[in-house]
Amino acid sequence: MDDYTNNLLSKIYVACHTLAISTEARWTAFVLFHRCLNVHSKSSSNTSTCHSNPGDNRKQRLANLASASVFLACKLSNETRRIRDVINVHQMLSFDDTADTTVIHLQDQPPLLDETYWETKAHVVKHEQDLLRIIGFNVTIEFPHRIVVAIWEELVQGQFVQCSKETSYSIIQSCWKYLNDVMFSSICTTSLRASALGCALLSLALEEHGLNDTENLEGLNWYEWVDVTRHEFHHAVNVVSKTKT
């Protein structure tokens, strides 16, 4: 993945935070954009996908698709934001490409309601439609967050894991920390099942706290509760481990 695409992913993360949308809406935005990127990488010369207009600048097209991903994610999550709000955030956030790490600057004022704004609005509407076509109208999203919470509550309530409330809170926070990392990974967001990903997140968090024993009192591995196989579980753990910062 090139630096510009990584910057766009960072921009999506900050934009979602600025728009004050939920964790699940943010996850939806990332999954949608990663699905688009996957098709783009496989069909870079196919004008029926991301190259709906061959004369478009690639960077600008991807930037518009990133904005469209956020806009569509808000709709799908019933957290609708005005298209102007999405455009404002999109245009107000800029990158310092000369830095060793991604540096994001926030302009003091939103863009003016000039011709450029109306052109951008038309682009966002157009690219939302393009985005849907690119991903084959697949807007089904699974959330590893729910898997993490469901399994952890069962482990604690079933007394399979003994820990204090403070440790319990810390474990969940570790899961969310790892989840923030995997949002930047196309493999994690589009190739792993949400159930396997959620189990991997929880396993790594438990390991971090010295509590990683996947076998419960009934002789089963807790990841089997959500129909995750041993192979799938260990593959997911391996993939997620490589994304940890």
Residue spans of the language-model regions?
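Non-catalytic, interaction-prone regions of core transcription and DNA-replication machinery
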Residues: 1-245
